[in-house]
Regions:
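The Walker A/P-loop phosphate-binding site
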Residues: 1-99
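Conserved inter-motif catalytic segment of the P-loop NTP-binding fold
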Residues: 2-5, 71-170
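Short gly/ser/thr-rich secondary-structure transition/capping motifs
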Residues: 16-21, 138, 210-213
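Conserved alpha/beta core segments of nucleic-acid transaction machinery
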Residues: 261-304
């Protein structure tokens, strides 16, 4: 058992050795720490998280390089999706993989098989729709021990949405502080970055301030406890006008802001365009056409 004395820094040894390079799983989200993704319901959190998971698991760029971490090699990713069913994730996984294939420089069957092999090895997706009770973070429970085993050696672990992984009052500061502490232990023990998806509060939605650090629903314990927070929110009329996005196309765009980063400099707003049918997100930059792109012809992924 670790004692408080064990945690004291050896000053002499520390000052005689260079600091380790920080391992950013996503820009500002370090391995071994907990972060959050805040967004209104229905805006595309799960789709975005699936895309991020597929990219990291296969060693591809994340959203055109906008969210690339320090280590670009393929890494293990685990997604616990409490509100999604197998049928929905079957579709989302197909769509995300087709997007990866379309972005590959070479799209021959050999490269597609290599991609599938990486996803099969590194990507663990658990659609828990209707089975949310299978995952509880209670200390010493069978579910907790199994969860730790599933997450061993992962680079990124996602819980979507956080509300489905505890049964307490999210307005209770003491309770939510304890919830965050459980996820911090998971991050510490596995060395993984843990990302908690959570809903935005009504005030931020109605006032159009979903990009702000205070947009998280419930008490401030979640925002205070995590080391990194990203916000997914609609593009406002003002931002659309500034960027040259036509108002008629606003529903096809979202903004991603890093509202809190303890270990990185503030980053610029990232604007993402959503595909009309699948909702898949791609990096958008001023100067690109704001009209809805024609749905790209799907490229089937080789399976044999």
């Amino acid at each position: 058992m670790t004692t408080l004395a064990d945690l004291r820094i050896n000053i002499r040894q520390t000052l005689r050795t260079p600091p380790p390079v920080l391992n950013h799983v996503l820009p500002g989200l370090l391995a071994g720490t907990v972060g959050s993704l805040i967004a209104p319901g229905g805006l595309g959190k799960t789709t975005l998280l699936t895309q991020i998971g597929c990219a990291i698991a296969s060693g591809n760029t994340v959203l055109g390089g906008a969210l690339d971490g320090t280590d670009r090699s393929p890494g293990k990713v685990v997604l616990f999706l409490a509100e999604e069913t197998l049928a929905i994730m079957h579709r989302k996984l197909h769509e995300a993989t087709e997007q990866l294939v379309s972005s590959m420089a070479s799209q021959n069957k050999k490269d597609q098989h290599a991609l599938l092999g990486l996803l099969e090895t590194n990507l663990g997706i658990y659609p828990l729709g209707g089975h949310g009770s299978l995952v509880h973070m209670g200390e010493g429970t069978k579910e907790c021990r199994e969860l730790f085993e599933l997450c061993a050696n992962a680079r990124l672990i996602v819980f979507d949405p956080l509300r489905q992984f505890h049964d307490g009052d999210e307005n209770d500061t003491a309770f939510m502080t304890a919830v965050v502490a459980r996820f911090q232990r998971l991050a510490r023990d596995t060395g993984s970055a843990v990302l908690l998806a959570h809903h935005a509060n009504r005030s931020s939605i109605s006032s159009g301030t979903g990009e702000q650090v205070g947009a998280s629903r419930g008490c401030t314990a979640l925002t205070d406890g995590v080391r990194w927070q990203a916000n997914l929110s609609p593009v406002s009329d003002a931002l659309a006008s500034e960027l040259g996005i036509e108002r008629a196309d606003l529903r096809d765009y979202v903004r991603l802001d890093c509202s809190k980063a303890n270990y990185a400099r503030p980053s610029a707003t990232v604007v993402l365009r959503k595909a009309p049918e699948s909702g898949l997100m791609t990096l958008w930059a001023p100067g690109q056409s704001s009209n809805r792109a024609a749905t790209a012809k799907k490229r089937p992924v080789a399976t044999q």
